[in-house]
Amino acid sequence: MASYRNSRSRSRSRFRRRRGRRSRVRGRDARQGRSSRRRRRGKGRAHSGKKGRRSGSRRRKRNNENK
């Protein structure tokens, strides 16, 4: 009986692990391969431009107030 129970538990754990890993890996691959690359590139360009504009406007406002 012990050997039969062990074989059952092992097979169940394997199926659970495989299913979990497969689903997680698919999600990670899809995100990293497609969307994250596009988002990272887009964000880098957009934020770099916006940061410069924001800091410039803030500096001008401060200078005007001081003057």
UniProtKB/Swiss-Prot annotation:
Q: Where in the cell is it found?
A: Nucleus; Chromosome
Instruction: Name the GO terms of the biological process aspect.
Output: cell differentiation; chromosome condensation; spermatogenesis
> Which first-to-last residue range defines the signal peptide?
none
**Where in the body, by tissue, does this protein show up?**
Testis.
Keywords, ordered alphabetically? Chromosome, Developmental protein, Differentiation, DNA condensation, DNA-binding, Nucleosome core, Nucleus, Spermatogenesis
Comp. bias (Basic residues): 7-25, 34-67
Q: Looking at the record's lineage, which domain of life comes first?
A: Eukaryota
- Note whether DNA-binding occurs among the keywords: yes
Annotated region (Disordered), positions in chain:
1-67
GO CC annotations?
Answer: nucleosome; nucleus
Stated role: Protamines substitute for histones in the chromatin of sperm during the haploid phase of spermatogenesis. They compact sperm DNA into a highly condensed, stable and inactive complex.
Give the protein family.
Belongs to the protamine P1 family.
Task: Write the protein's name.
Answer: Sperm protamine P1
Q: What is the phylogenetic placement of the source species in the record?
A: Eukaryota, Metazoa, Chordata, Craniata, Vertebrata
